[in-house]
């Protein structure tokens, strides 16, 4: 028996509600047969070329995953998109652990973009001491994030790589470390003749306009 709510989601996506069965295994067998039937079907295009069909789907279970219909739909939708992200053409069941992990990753990405937009970085200056006389002749600028969940440079750089924001990290590092140097100089925390070493991303050097502004 199918569905008691509108099946269409968008485009080629649909909801199906299976109920009245004695076990999950019965439904799994039906889904397997449905997937097989679709995979054995092809659409013939006007050119005569045949386009094979594949079925990608996600399954959530009542009451194991949730007793709320909208939540069950959301969980099934999440499972389906995991299929589409990996290898299309099969049906998978909702995984709460994967869903929780994905939610955490989404939140970390949101925090990362907030960090970029609001420039929430601090650059600590690690002194470099001369072996000859013990004086400080340079500082190395060490980046730290200002959000509790996102402080370590390796976390920040990994997210920057995944979100294709390495250039923005490079630009901010150059400008904000120089700004920190100027602040320390104006407050007499450094002499002003020390060198400043900055860890740069070799493939992400500043463009002409950024270099002029710097």
PLM regions: where:
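Conserved helix-loop-beta segment at the catalytic/binding core of cyclic-nucleotide signaling proteins
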Residues: 1-24
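Active-site core of bacterial EAL-family cyclic-dinucleotide phosphodiesterase domains
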Residues: 104-161, 199
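Catalytic core of bacterial c-di-GMP phosphodiesterases, primarily the EAL and HD-GYP domains
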Residues: 135-137, 166-214
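Flexible, glycine/charge-rich interdomain/linker segments that couple
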Residues: 63, 82-107, 191-200
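Catalytic-core segments of nucleotide cyclases and related cyclic-nucleotide turnover enzymes
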Residues: 28, 47, 62-88, 154, ...
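Catalytic strand-loop-helix junctions within cyclic-nucleotide turnover domains
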Residues: 17-27, 46-50, 54-72, 97-100, ...
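Catalytic/regulatory signature loops of cyclic-dinucleotide turnover enzymes
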Residues: 73-95, 111-122, 146-150
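Catalytic core regions of nucleotide second-messenger enzymes
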Residues: 7-9, 38-55, 84, 185-194
């Amino acid at each position: 028996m199918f569905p008691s709510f509108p099946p269409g989601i968008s485009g080629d996506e649909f909801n199906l509600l299976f109920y009245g069965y004695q076990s999950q295994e019965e439904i799994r067998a039906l889904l397997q047969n449905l997937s097989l039937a679709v995979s054995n079907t092809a659409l013939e295009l006007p050119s005569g070329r045949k386009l094979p069909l594949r079925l990608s789907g996600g399954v959530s279970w009542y009451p194991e995953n949730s007793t709320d219909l909208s939540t069950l739909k959301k969980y099934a939708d999440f499972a389906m998109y995991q299929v589409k992200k990996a290898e299309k053409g099969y049906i998978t069941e909702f995984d709460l652990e994967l869903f929780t992990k994905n939610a955490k990753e989404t939140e970390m990405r949101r925090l990362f973009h907030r960090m970029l937009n609001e420039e929430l970085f601090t650059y600590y200056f690690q002194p470099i001491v001369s072996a000859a006389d013990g004086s400080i002749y340079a500082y190395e600028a060490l980046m730290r994030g200002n959000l509790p969940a996102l402080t370590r440079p390796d976390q920040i750089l990994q997210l920057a790589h995944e979100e294709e924001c390495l250039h923005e990290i490079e630009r901010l590092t150059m400008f904000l470390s120089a700004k920190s140097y100027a602040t320390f100089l104006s407050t007499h925390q450094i002499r002003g003749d020390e060198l400043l070493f900055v860890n740069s991303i070799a493939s992400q050097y500043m463009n002409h306009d950024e270099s002029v502004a710097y």
